[in-house]
Amino acid sequence: MSKIVYLGHSSFLLKGNDYSLVIDPYQNGSVPNLKFPNVEPVDVVVCSHEHADHNARELVNIKDNPTPVGAVSATVPHDDCGGAKRGLNKIHMFDIEGYKIVHLGDTGCILDERTLEPFKNCDILLAPINGFYTIGPRELKEIANIIKPRILIPMHYYMKEHNSGYPDGNMIEEFKKLFPNYRYLDKEELDLDEYKNYQGVLLFR
């Protein structure tokens, strides 16, 4: 069993056969019209950086006997001026039952090929498209052209259907123009085995 469960904003529950983790849980009140959901106990909580919409570790329970979960990471700017405005951010890559899942956190600028080298040809790329606090769709296009993920999933954008997330000028529509090979998922859970042969973009509703 290998699953990605979308928890809203930039947060996900990643589940393997015997281990699980939550990345970037958000403080209640930090993201417009979103409340962090109740989540089963996990082995580890990972935060890309220490902003309130990404670091609510206390909202996630840890298992009594947690399994260590390793990750490949890279520290990058949260902005387009070397971190001077918003500090630094960590990209993480996890191996979930053989699926390589990369989470860009709040990456704030286009990154060079050397920085992105460890993440090339990943199975899943979870990437922000806010365009103000993070990169937007155009910057992501350049990053995706280097990483070449099998599946791209956008995050950290205003979701009109739920009136949730930070206003961003409807970045999801610009994203869909740049990445036209997309498919909407009918639930907030992705079974990776069901999509092991899929290539393209997946969107959570």
Describe the function of each predicted region.
Residues 43, 123, 150:
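Conserved acidic residues
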Residues 11-14, 92-94:
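Short beta-strand scaffold segments in enzyme catalytic cores
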Residues 83-147:
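Active-site-proximal loop/helix segments of hydrolase catalytic cores
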Residues 3-6, 20-24, 71-77, 91-93, ...:
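Active-site-proximal beta-strand elements of phosphoester/diester hydrolases
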